[in-house]
């Protein structure tokens, strides 16, 4: 089963995340199938960059976003709030 989730990058105490598509059983920082976007919580306001076309493609293929990624997708306007 595929998941759309965050993988951590960045320096210690300065997190930045990639939004990736990967197998649900793989470790957090393992290799990934596709890069969908980035999320930087350290900027004010926090920065979310998502390739909507890729995100919708993978959701259409059955990839399940995690709760955090689902919130980010709604915030970016990629998916409905329903």
Swiss-Prot record:
An annotated GO BP: translation
Q: Where are the coiled-coil regions?
A: none
Q: Which UniProt keywords are listed?
A: Ribonucleoprotein, Ribosomal protein
GO MF, any single term: structural constituent of ribosome
Q: Does the keyword Cytoplasm apply?
A: no
InterPro entries associated with the record: Ribosomal_bS16, Ribosomal_bS16_CS, Ribosomal_bS16_dom_sf
Q: Report one GO cellular component.
A: cytoplasm
| Membrane-crossing segments per the record | none
Show the NCBIfam families listed in the entry: S16
> Family per UniProt?
Belongs to the bacterial ribosomal protein bS16 family.
Q: What is this protein called?
A: Small ribosomal subunit protein bS16
List the source organism.
Answer: Dehalococcoides mccartyi (strain ATCC BAA-2266 / KCTC 15142 / 195) (Dehalococcoides ethenogenes (strain 195))
């Amino acid at each position: 089963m595929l998941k759309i989730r965050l993988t951590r990058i960045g320096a210690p105490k300065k997190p930045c995340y990639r939004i990736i598509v990967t197998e649900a059983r793989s470790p957090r920082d393992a290799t990934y199938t596709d890069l969908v976007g980035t999320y930087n919580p350290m900027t004010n306001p926090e920065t979310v960059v998502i390739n909507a076309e890729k995100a919708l493609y993978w959701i259409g293929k059955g990839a399940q976003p995690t709760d955090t990624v689902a919130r980010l997708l709604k915030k970016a306007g990629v998916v409905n709030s329903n």
